């Protein structure tokens, strides 16, 4: 899902892992910085919405007594709608960045035994890379239904 440098291998070859168990930790400093930056931008956008909301309330009273023009009120209302859209956009960007941060920890898709480690600490993995990072061998019980005639007994 994301690319980066492998900081830690969180298992030993030949050990049993459960589905969802963390296997690798990518360097997440960039992802953390992105989340922090986008969170600050979101707070600025929310503050702008609050400012424009207060201004609109004031302008609503002023436009009724012709103290300001209808055009000025409409412009402020348009700015307010744009600011609300900016907040929604920043929430989506922040959500995506938080997801990227979560994906910096690579988990096992299935339970099984780690058969082979294909990347080591310090390796660079790319987003969309189709190569496996480790081989998890699923070791399950196998049940066989066999029909046997009484004469073969």
Would you name each region that the model predicts?
Residues 23, 132-133:
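Local beta-strand/beta-hairpin segments that build beta-sheet-rich folds
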Residues 2-127, 141-145, 151-153:
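Amphipathic alpha-helical coiled-coil/rod segments that serve as protein-protein coupling scaffolds
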């Amino acid at each position: 899902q994301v690319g980066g440098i492998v900081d830690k291998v969180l298992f030993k070859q030949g050990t049993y892992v459960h589905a969802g168990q963390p296997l690798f930790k990518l360097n997440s400093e960039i992802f953390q910085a992105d989340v922090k930056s986008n969170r600050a931008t979101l707070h600025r956008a929310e503050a702008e919405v609050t400012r424009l909301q207060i201004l609109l309330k004031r302008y609503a009273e002023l436009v009724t007594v012709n103290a300001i023009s209808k055009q000025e009120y409409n412009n402020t209302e348009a700015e307010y709608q744009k600011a609300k859209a900016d907040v929604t956009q920043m929430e989506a960007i922040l959500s995506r960045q938080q997801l990227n941060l979560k994906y910096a920890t690579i988990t096992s898709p299935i339970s099984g035994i780690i058969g082979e480690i294909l990347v080591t600490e310090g390796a660079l993995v790319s987003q969309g890379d189709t190569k496996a990072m480790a081989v998890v061998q699923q070791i399950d019980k196998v049940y066989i239904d066999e029909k046997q005639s009484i004469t073969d007994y």
